[in-house]
Amino acid sequence: GKVVTLPSVSTIADGTAVKTPGNRLFPYLQKNLDDIITVPDEDLIVAFLDMVENHKMIVENSGLLTVAALKQLDVKDKKIVSILSGGNMDVITMSSVVQQGLVQRSRIFTVSVLLPDKPGELVRVASIIAEANGNVIKLEHNQFVSINRKATVELRITIEAFGHEHKDEIVDKLEAAGLRPRIVKVNI
């Protein structure tokens, strides 16, 4: 192999985002490395959320590469040491990574439903979500989505859930009530 230069690098692991690896490092890696694992940003987001929720640690994305890479390997019943490093992350980035992680895990999701424009419909939808143990964290009520706005309004509901199965349960209950929910991009 040889050292190659990438035209660009885009990753949330900015501490390791280099177009060209160092010339001194390459011969060492060539001699001692068995394999290279690439880690997508989505896996780093999940690893970050795991560290915050389960270990109460803030580790910057580059420092989590080993943890995220381990999830791609069969390491069950093996003794593994994963080196964690760095806490150099600003709160805006941290907030964004946490939100993306919650969305990936279906802990937060947004649905859009079209409702008749009459009193009681919002309460009906909120009751269905509450009965399914979902927690409404944001509502957007838009009367101007339909050409025939006197008859229909769009309601976008951002919901907190316990994960993928719970999200599916909530969506199924909305569907069973005839609401035809559509999953849309979370906008918090």
Q: Which ranges hold each PLM region?
A:
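Active-site-adjacent helical/loop segments in soluble small-molecule enzymes
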Residues: 22-78
